[in-house]
Amino acid sequence: MNMNQTTSPALSQVETAIRAPAGNFAKYNYYSVFDIVRQTRKQFINANMSWPGSRGGKAWDLAMGQAQYIRCMFRENQLTRRVRGTLQQTPDNGTNLSSSAVGGIQGQAERRPDLATLMVVNDAINQQIPTLLPYHFPHDQVELSLLNTDVSLEDIISESSIDWPWFLSNSLTGDNSNYAMELASRLSPEQQTLPTEPDNSTATDLTSFYQTNLGLKTADYTPFEALNTFARQLAITVPPGGTVDCGYSACQPAV
């Protein structure tokens, strides 16, 4: 506050808000909003029954709001000064960094060539498309909840449901055997459909399909029964001890 001022600017705003004469707070030894909020609301009202009277509660509330705002601004300025001081102590060597990697960055025109033709409509702006398709929200939530554990969903069910023969021995089968193998695949229901749905291709020779989509010249799916081959051709990784087995002896992908 300026030494030549009797009332702070913040307190002057309170006077204006309650329609009090300018400088009236100073007559009662209130020179800033902090002089007011040093008292509780009740204490301030009781000490100033003669003035401002019924407006005492509103005056205290406004003063408290101004005081909180000033505190926030003060702390923000302090933090800004500290951050700037820290940055000044840390030299920026960005000009010395190699820019060789910049050439490998894909431009937006290459990453999203469809943007130029998109209409500015609600679906184009707000539609959320998962990065991994097909997407199954419940399965994704289960996988996320088990992400930091060494236990799979199959292990959890096998420990809690010993009535499933498959969990007791691979040679024992029952009504839930196929379901148990589906759990072991760690694929969502929609993902399991891809390798298990019937072939709807009218072509008798699928060599071109496998060569185009999976990079191997073969007439059927049998080379991909080997996990390493399947993962390598799809450029995917399998967690240690994991499997991408769909649980069926014939996992021919649909065309």
UniProtKB/Swiss-Prot annotation:
The keyword Cytoplasm does not apply. It comes from the Bacteria. Keywords: Plasmid, Virulence. The keyword Translocase does not apply. Disruption phenotype: No effect on virulence in mice. Belongs to the SpvA family. NCBIfam families: PRK15212.1. In Salmonella spp. the spv gene cluster is encoded on a highly transmissible plasmid. Part of a Salmonella virulence gene cluster. This is Virulence protein SpvA. It comes from Salmonella dublin. The gene is spvA.
